Regions:
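PLP-dependent aminotransferase class I/II
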Residues: 158-162, 269-273, 292, 442-528
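Conserved beta-loop-beta/alpha segment of the NTase-like Rossmann-fold superfamily
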Residues: 60-132
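N-terminal nucleotide-binding beta1-loop-alpha1 segment
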Residues: 1-10
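Conserved PLP-binding catalytic core of the aspartate aminotransferase-like
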Residues: 509, 522-556
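Conserved core of the sugar-phosphate nucleotidyltransferase
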Residues: 104-188
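N-terminal "arm"/small-domain region of PLP-dependent enzymes with the aminotransferase-like
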Residues: 230-288, 376-377
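Active-site pre-lysine segment of PLP-dependent enzymes
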Residues: 110-114, 363-377, 389-452
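Conserved N-terminal catalytic core of the sugar/cofactor nucleotidyltransferase
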Residues: 22-92
């Protein structure tokens, strides 16, 4: 019945749910039409007549469709529905398919072309999977079925999920499965699952059912609206698929096969011991409230070695950007483009004064900024250093010149240094120093703790200034519990791992240097040097930026940032590629060099 799909199955059976505009049943019957089948038997229950009318005679040229009605569908489970079709199973070999699946066409060829007569398609366990699991040996013999109530998260490495597509021979159905199913239902009733019969059969000395792993074939089981949303992303095509991924703004753990070169995270931190410490305290942190702003300001001050009165902690830098710009960035606001769009998006559009460097690398110096904005009457100037997405970097000595100029001009200067620890000089280039902040109360520094510290899921960021009244006011703007206990505890223990953090940043710089040289060998890319954890690349041949992004995603499950649609690029073909660890970077390089 699909109750968890809510309104989508209020007046429709589950297989009528549409994925990207196509009902599941239509997709399935079209796939079956391409096979050499004697008939298709559909067991119907809830809204069965509506389903029959929907199917009509549209598939008569390729399929012989028969229906079996389950009049007590609301009191039974799938074991009863299958039992209603047992006579059909006794007549011929059977493909058994559940109606809430979406999968690639090749799945049927995979199971039909395999000579073994009795097979269950299985997929290596991934975190999204729910329901019956199996364990198999090196010969794909099924050792046991693991029902949902016996699932053990400590044993997931040994689990395979049943895809719920089976091939049963006529003999297996007649001599093994159906006799056991009949005995099972007599003993336990009809409100059970047919997989439980297979679990019982595994206790036989000789099990005639083998598993067939599907490898990287795409599939999804749709039980609720979240499943539907994910399935529509996985099974979208081309530009539509890329757009669906981009609109998620993260959460890519739901897509374990996707390699994310879009979002920007240090691959070498935090270290394993720190992760273990966080895990060891998980239960306590999960069940207790975090501290308020006073304690977290103290922790942030300790984290960066600055006065707690100079810093405000946020639920990611994005929260602080919003709070600051919407309230304090009044008057004309200078922005260096291209940039992280959250900054200009939060400002009043009519107040924006845009500086777009006049070169193909989008590079600029402190002197370029001063010369452009000198006569613009700014109240606020903001930019990112190193910049996003260009990777352009203004050295600290030149940045101090810009700080002095804005001070003399009574301009508030906001510098986002979220990527500064990736620079060759590392943390030595930071502006988060009490002496710098205290001497320049017009200076505001934003720093994300997601990027170089490798913990974007914790949603941590800080805003700092020598203007204590400003910081005090910002602390009142955000909620009293604006970060969670896990983020707070991370800040609490960071000091124990700080030396490892600096080692990780140096290791990152080494990999960035290697990766840059390799990227430069891709003939259709012009790679712009970067001091951040990404490269802005111009595509000079073969593809547009959107075509390359779509191709990498559809063929290789690799996600990159298409910058071509951003206004500052004026339709030019630029992409941004994150720097990950060597293994991941080499996978991207192999894909780029194959295209």
């Amino acid at each position: 019945m699909g109750r968890r799909l809510g309104e989508l199955t209020k007046n429709n059976t589950k297989c009528m749910v549409e994925v990207n505009g196509i009902p599941l049943i239509d997709r399935l019957l079209s796939q079956l039409s391409a096979l050499d089948l004697s008939r298709v038997v559909i067991v119907v229950g809830y809204e069965g007549e509506k389903l029959k009318r929907h199917i009509g005679d549209r598939y008569d040229s390729g399929l012989k469709i028969e229906y079996i009605d389950n009049p007590i569908y609301d009191k039974t489970n799938n074991i009863y529905s299958l039992a209603l079709a047992k006579d059909k199973m006794l007549e011929q070999d059977t493909l058994l398919i559940e109606s809430d699946l979406i999968f690639e066409d090749n799945m049927f060829r995979l199971i039909l072309d395999n000579p073994y007569p009795n097979l269950a398609l299985v997929a290596k366990y991934e975190p999204w999977m729910d329901g019956t699991m199996v364990r198999i040996d090196e010969n794909c013999n099924i050792l046991d079925f693991v029902p949902k109530h016996l699932f053990n998260y400590n044993e997931t490495d040994s689990y395979y999920k049943t895809v719920n597509i089976y091939k049963f021979s006529k003999d297996f159905s007649a001599n093994v499965y159906i006799p056991f199913m009949e005995a099972y239902t007599r003993a336990l009733g009809n409100n059970e699952y047919y997989e439980q019969v297979l679990r019982v059969i595994t206790f036989l000395d000789k099990l005639e059912l083998k598993a067939l792993p599907i490898g990287d074939e795409r599939w999804y089981e749709i039980d609720d609206v979240q499943d539907l949303d994910i399935a529509e992303t996985i099974f979208a095509e081309g530009k539509e698929q890329l757009g669906k991924y981009m609109k998620r703004f993260g959460g890519y753990w739901r897509f374990p096969k996707v390699l994310d070169f879009c979002y920007l995270v240090n691959p070498y931190f935090p270290p394993q011991k720190m992760r273990c410490e966080l895990r060891a305290n998980f239960d306590k942190l999960l069940t207790e409230y975090p501290s308020g702003m006073a304690v977290n300001s103290l922790l942030a001050g300790k984290y960066f070695g600055i006065n707690r009165a100079h810093v405000c902690v946020g639920n990611g830098a994005a929260e602080l950007i919003k709070a600051y710009i919407e309230k304090y960035a009044q008057g004309k606001t200078g922005v260096v483009y291209p940039t992280f769009e959250e900054y200009p998006n939060r400002a009043v559009a009519d107040n924006l004064v845009k500086f777009i460097p006049g070169n193909k690398d989008f590079s600029y110096t402190a002197r370029d900024i001063i010369e452009f904005f000198t006569d613009k009457g700014l109240s606020t100037l903001l930019f990112i250093n190193p910049d996003n997405p260009s990777g352009n970097y203004i050295p600290k000595c030149d940045l101090l010149e810009l700080i002095a100029w804005t001070k003399a001009q009574c301009i508030t200067l906001l510098v986002d240094e979220s990527f500064v620890d990736f620079t060759t000089g590392g943390a030595e280039n930071t502006l988060l120093r009490d002496e710098v902040l205290a001497a320049n109360t017009h200076l505001v520094v934003v720093k994300s703790i997601s990027k170089s510290y490798g913990v974007p899921g914790l949603r941590l960021g800080v805003i700092a200034s020598g203007n204590k009244d400003l910081i005090s006011s910002l602390k009142k703007e955000v909620a009293i519990w604006n970060i969670n206990s896990f983020a707070e505890y991370y800040m609490q223990i960071f000091g124990k791992y700080e030396s490892e953090y600096h080692v990780a940043c140096k290791k990152f710089v080494e990999e960035r240097t290697r990766f840059y040289k390799e990227l430069c060998s891709v003939p259709y890319l012009r790679v712009i040097p970067s001091q951040a954890n990404y490269f802005l690349c111009e595509i000079t041949d073969k593809y547009t930026s959107s075509e390359l992004a779509e191709t990498l995603l559809s063929r290789y499950n690799i996600l990159i940032k298409d910058c071509g649609s951003k206004s500052a690029f004026a339709g030019s073909n630029y992409i941004r590629i994150a720097v990950r660890d060597q293994a991941d970077n080499d996978m991207l390089l192999a894909a780029l060099k194959t295209l």
